[in-house]
């Protein structure tokens, strides 16, 4: 599923991401835009053999099990396929675990490069939340 901007913002808010670990909703919507273009079915293979899955491009080396990533830790205890669902609950729950680690949202390269230090509120402007 490809979410609309405000549709995704509303879903993320409902699932408790607004100000989760101090990151406003705009940060999460911005990250999703530049990680997956709001597409829950996005997958991208990495040079180390791992794959990033779903709307927040969660990595199989650490966070989920896809059965083909050597030494996968599966710290979210989920199959990576769960991260491709049109229902973003699994992605959000895993993202909460990721952002609670030492690096915060810097765990997402796209957030670091495209969202951090910008006017992320623009990503939810005009949305009825």
Curated annotation (Swiss-Prot):
InterPro entries: Glyco_hydro_22, Glyco_hydro_22_CS, Glyco_hydro_22_lys, Lysozyme-like_dom_sf. Keywords: Antimicrobial, Bacteriolytic enzyme, Disulfide bond, Glycosidase, Hydrolase, Secreted. The active site is at residues 35, 52. It comes from the Eukaryota. It catalyses: Hydrolysis of (1->4)-beta-linkages between N-acetylmuramic acid and N-acetyl-D-glucosamine residues in a peptidoglycan and between N-acetyl-D-glucosamine residues in chitodextrins. GO terms for cellular component: extracellular region. Lysozyme C is capable of both hydrolysis and transglycosylation; it also shows a slight esterase activity. It acts rapidly on both peptide-substituted and unsubstituted peptidoglycan, and slowly on chitin oligosaccharides. PANTHER family: LYSOZYME C. Lysozymes have primarily a bacteriolytic function; those in tissues and body fluids are associated with the monocyte-macrophage system and enhance the activity of immunoagents. This is Lysozyme C. It comes from Tragopan temminckii (Temminck's tragopan).
């Amino acid at each position: 599923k490809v979410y609309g901007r405000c549709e995704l913002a509303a879903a993320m808010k409902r699932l408790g991401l607004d100000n989760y670990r101090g990151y406003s909703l705009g940060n999460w919507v911005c990250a999703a835009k530049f990680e997956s273009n709001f597409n829950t079915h996005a997958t991208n293979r990495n040079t180390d053999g791992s794959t990033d899955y779903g709307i927040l491009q969660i990595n199989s080396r650490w966070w989920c099990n896809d059965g083909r990533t050597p030494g996968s830790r599966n710290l979210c205890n989920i199959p990576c396929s769960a991260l491709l669902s049109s229902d973003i609950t699994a992605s959000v729950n895993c993202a909460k675990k990721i952002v609670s680690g030492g690096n915060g949202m810097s765990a997402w390269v796209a957030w670091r490069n495209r969202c951090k230090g910008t006017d992320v509120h623009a990503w939810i402007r005009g949305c009825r939340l």
